[in-house]
Amino acid sequence: MTKLRIKVVKKGNAYDLYGQDLPLQFKENRMTPECDQFELGQEFEVDNLDCPPGFCSWALADIQRDMSHIFFRGNYPWVAQKGATLVCCTDGFRPVFFKIERIED
């Protein structure tokens, strides 16, 4: 049975992306500098394309296309490791980067 492992490999923040000259200011008292939904190194395993428990539904919407591609035995020709890819959520202030790997029994 095919499964996917989704691992948090990087958490960004607005200052990493843009330096001190942010193109749009945010209210620091309303938002953490980095995403607080995930921890670096956190892993999720799924045997379908449903949202794993504890996974951000917004991030899932962003990476679901790549999850489907890898889950259904797709590969990307520019990625050396078959059955894997790197993706990120589209939060322009605090993106989270994920490694998706296919696990086959």
Question: Each predicted region: which residue ranges?
Answer:
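Ser/Thr- (and often Asn-) enriched beta-sheet segments in non-cytosolic proteins
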Residues: K3-K7, E43-E45, F97-E104
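Short, basic/aromatic beta-hairpin or loop at an interaction surface
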Residues: L4-Q25
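Generic structural motif
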Residues: V9-N13, L49-C51, I103-D105
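Short, flexible N-terminal segments of the mature chain
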Residues: Q20-D50
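Disulfide-bonded cysteines in secreted/extracellular proteins and peptides
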Residues: C35, C56, C88-C89
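Short, Lys/Arg- and Gly-enriched loop/turn segments at beta-strand edges
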Residues: C51-D62
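Short, compact, well-ordered microdomains
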Residues: L60-D105
